[in-house]
Amino acid sequence: YISDHGADFPRSKGSIYESGTRIPMILNFPPRFSSGTVEKGMVSTIDILPTMLQAAGIGIPKQLPGFPLQELDQGAREGRKYIHTFTTGSAPALHFIQFGIRDDRYKLIYNPYRRKNLLAASRYINSKLSQDQHFEAFLFPDEFELYDLLNDPYEFKNLAYLVEYENKKIELLQRMRQFQKEINDPFLSKANLDVFEKEQLAHQKISYRKKAGFNWPHLDLFRKANIEK
């Protein structure tokens, strides 16, 4: 069992801030899992499929990025050192691309396009909250955001441009790029990102839903890129 990804508020559902990505996970499969245990290590929803495959006695394809949680329960491995997150805003009308990575204390967010965050704007306009000092930061976020989740759990103080946090920023960014390479992420290519960005912004009125046989152009582009690799 996992919950939905946060409340429908600014910086919550649909975003990659903690209130939109940190959710409970419950496993109940006796006797395959120990009962009454609480795992404090980090896991991800990408671990669900490998877990189910192993429980069913099916081999786990090597290309899957997740791992079976049975290994965690049996003490064969520790929780993840890094958790990766990503969003496009879930629909063209809410489009905003964000990449994220966190370790047990720090989180780095990469916003490749410095423009209005349509997802954040929609959540704000439809809420009854009064404007405050944090509104501008999530409506027009910096290219990089770095947060100390221990001392700043609500992610308000951006440390990404402070000299003393430069090494942590570089470490997390390198790990993010490494993971993208490992999973053959088409968005590792800036050209692919630009195509997708332009395409989504052109369809914000979602009129494509009325077009018979409509196909997103970026799908063919990404397939071609994978074949060429």
Model-identified regions with their sequence ranges:
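Long, internal low-complexity/basic segments
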Residues: 22, 139-143, 149-151, 159-229
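Non-transmembrane alpha-helical segments in soluble domains
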Residues: 49-53, 57, 70, 98, ...
